[in-house]
């Protein structure tokens, strides 16, 4: 995921979080890359971060710690690009589960097997605030859109389908991208019987000697900038707003698919 922290009109920090995960979705390591944009060509830049093992990844600028526990970079007019690690909880939890011929199996158990496979990505939004609504405490979740992409070898995977997503087949491989909106169902206090907003992605396929290489997941909340809940007066209004979100995710999926070509 990526976010910008603007300190003034000429200086900003872009932060991208990379999560290296195990086959079940559990976190192996979190790497954070920061870019401090030195629009004012300052000689030094102050920066506050919780990262550990911070290192400059694009130059030889160094830093010192000041009395406020801030890093003061000797920028000499340049932008600063650095990287570090962190162990804090992620705002969205990802769980990856597998089935083979309808039976739940582990990642190790499905490896090398053949049959009807299902790969399911479940997302749990953990970032929320508690607010009082009508005398009752409610959880209001920070909205996140999740995009997961897979590149599947057509010698292994065939007859691929996905819920809440798109499939592109170039002959040698199948690119799958799906999206989910965890926490939005709860924010809107909407019954799944009336309207279900996806909080998971499920990929099914016939497999031969199952082997899954890299999967990529992107989390973003920028798509919700135009999502106005005050305009939701009917199911049609909700459908229109969700259609806009879906359109935005489709564009993101199309853009992500281009990266594989």
Feature map (PLM): residue ranges:
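Cytosol-facing boundaries of transmembrane alpha helices in integral membrane proteins
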Residues: 1-260
């Amino acid at each position: 995921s990526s976010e910008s922290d603007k300190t003034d009109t000429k200086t900003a920090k872009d932060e991208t979080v990379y999560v290296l995960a195990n086959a079940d979705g559990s976190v192996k390591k979190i790497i954070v890359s920061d870019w401090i944009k030195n629009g004012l060509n300052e000689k030094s830049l102050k920066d506050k971060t919780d990262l550990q093992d911070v290192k400059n990844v694009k130059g030889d600028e160094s830093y010192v710690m000041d009395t406020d526990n801030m890093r003061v970079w000797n920028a000499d007019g340049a932008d600063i690009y650095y990287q570090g690690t962190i162990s804090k909880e992620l705002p969205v939890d990802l769980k990856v589960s597998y089935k083979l011929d309808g039976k739940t199996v582990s990642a190790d158990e499905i490896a090398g097997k053949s049959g009807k496979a299902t790969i399911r990505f479940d997302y749990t939004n953990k970032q929320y605030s508690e607010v009082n609504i009508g005398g009752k405490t409610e959880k209001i979740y920070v909205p996140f859109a999740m995009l997961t992409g897979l590149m599947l070898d057509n010698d292994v995977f065939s007859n691929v389908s996905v819920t809440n997503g798109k499939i592109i087949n170039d002959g040698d491989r199948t690119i799958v991208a799906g999206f989910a909106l965890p926490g939005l169902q709860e924010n809107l206090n909407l019954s799944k019987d009336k309207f279900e907003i996806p909080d998971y992605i499920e990929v099914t396929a016939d497999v031969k000697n199952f082997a899954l290489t890299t999967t990529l997941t992107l989390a973003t909340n920028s798509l919700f900038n135009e999502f106005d809940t005050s305009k939701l007066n009917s199911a049609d209004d909700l459908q229109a707003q969700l259609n806009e979100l879906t359109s935005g995710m489709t564009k993101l999926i199309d853009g992500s698919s281009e990266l594989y070509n």
